[in-house]
Structures are given as C-alpha cells and as structure tokens.
C-alpha cells in the first residue's frame, strides 16, 4: 500500500512539473529610490543665494527575491539600505512585500505593492523600529527575462524622536526584476 501511494505521488509530481501551465516563477529584484524635501534654509528674497526650494533628502537601495503567482500576485522578501542625510539616519530595512498587478498589456504591468517589516539602525542615536510602505508602479517588459520598473512609494519608518515618532517620506524610483 505504501509503495502504491509513493508511486502515485511520484506520478502526480511528474505530471505537475511537466505540465504546460506553470503556477508561477521565482524572481530577483532591485531598486534605487530618491526622496525630495523642502530646503529649510530657503527664503523668498531678491538675492537667491540660499539654494532651491526643493532639494534631494534621501536615497534608498533595495534588493530582494520572491515568487510570482499566475502573473498577478507576487510575494517577496527584501532588504536594503536607507540614507537620510538631512537627519543623519542610516537604516537597514528588512521586510516582506505583496505586489498585485492591476493591469497587464504586452509584457507591461501597472502594480500596487504593500510592505511591512523591521528597520535596523546601526547608530545608537535612534532605536530600531518598524517599516511600512505602499507604492504604485509600472513594470515594462524588456529583453528575455529582464524587466524595468518605475515607481512612486510612500514610506513610514517608526523612529522615536520625530514628530509622532515616525519619519514619513515619498520616493521616486527605478529598478529591475529578473525572472
């Protein structure tokens, strides 16, 4: 009886692995995002020596790996490095993400992605905190298995010492996904 069950399971696994329609596919992803902020030293005066009103304020690097199901839903684990030079904050977020492709046309998709995880800070100035994010983006199909992504994201980092003990930012980014 055990041999029959094992043989049946082996046949089912073989059938599933050789079938035409696959459940999904693994992928590797990477992003670079930047955040713009208001220049706190900016003043409206005739001599404009205090710089522009809007200045870059942060840079985020992200890498991750995950699995896409039926070209509609993707689950991934990501890690990264965040640098907020205005506040001298360096952080390492690690988080899980859930991406849903809203539309798909000619290998290009529009998607929404939510993120939740932990943020680690190497400095003793700020304690570790939580990391949340939500974003919209476009993934453009490229050569073979490499796709380009463009995105806009809202990030919330739980950091004690800021207003409401959090640091919120909106970032613009581009990246890739390799299937």
Where are these regions (language model features)?
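Bacterial Sec-dependent N-terminal signal peptides
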Residues: 1-24
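Transmembrane beta-strand segments of Gram-negative outer membrane beta-barrel proteins
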Residues: 21-40
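Outer-membrane beta-barrel "beta-signal"
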Residues: 33-37, 98, 165-179
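Surface-exposed strand-loop-strand hairpins of Gram-negative outer-membrane beta-barrel proteins
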Residues: 37-60
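Gram-negative (and chloroplast) outer-membrane scaffold detector with strong preference
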Residues: 38, 59-135, 140-146
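Extracytoplasmic loops and strand-loop junctions of Gram-negative outer membrane beta-barrel proteins
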Residues: 44-49, 119, 155-158
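A cross-taxonomic marker for long C-terminal extensions/tails that follow the last structured domain
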Residues: 147-157, 163-171, 176
